[in-house]
Amino acid sequence: VKADPVISELPVADPISYDPHKTLNEASISGGAVIGVSGENITGTWSWADDSTVPVVDVTDYDVVFTPDDQKHYNSIRGTIQVNVLTANVNIADLPTASAITYGDSLAKSVLYGGTAYFDGINKVEIFGTFAWKDDSLKPFVSDSDKTLYTVVFTPADSVNYNTAEIEITVNVSKAAMPNLLLSVDNTHKTVGSIALPG
């Protein structure tokens, strides 16, 4: 009957960045120690229990298997190690466009439309999400029109595995209409009372 070795020290995995097409097979395993029935170190290899798994940021524990070189006398043994998966950066392929506003309006009145983001990893992947003004309370002047850059933040729909990204765009600001300066005066008058003057 083959014996079960004992893990005295688990191996460690190198940190990797998230990639929807990157499996655990891309994460290197190193170290680890296994001992036999007599306390001797057993040589062998560590591998992922399922190397087709795509590691994600919010899952840290993954199973590994130690396969001894002496498979005649020892069974394989399984353990669990942690993998540090880093959030991935996205690139903005096409900038969004801002709708025009009128002087006096804040950026909140300017609607952002269009724009695309992607992740350039093992394969290029389009990333879905939303664009929004970083500070939509700002009120541009007409002199800022199509010239001053304002920061827009892209928030990925998958905010767990991808970082936000910031870009800068301009906005068209038109002059506000002059207020009506004509005053409407009521020409009627009312008698509120009378007094007798001394004579």
Model region roles, listed by residue range:
Residues K2-G39, N84-N123, K175-G199:
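Solvent-exposed, low-complexity, repeat-rich "mucin-like" stalks and linkers
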Residues I35-S76, I81-V83, D120-N161, I169:
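Serine/threonine-rich, repeat-prone extracellular segments and beta-strand-based repeat modules
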Residues E26, I77-G79, K109, A165-I167:
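Short capping micro-motif at the N-terminus of alpha-helices
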Residues Y74-S76, A93, Y162-T164, L181:
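Short acidic, gly/pro-rich beta-turn/loop elements at beta-sheet edges
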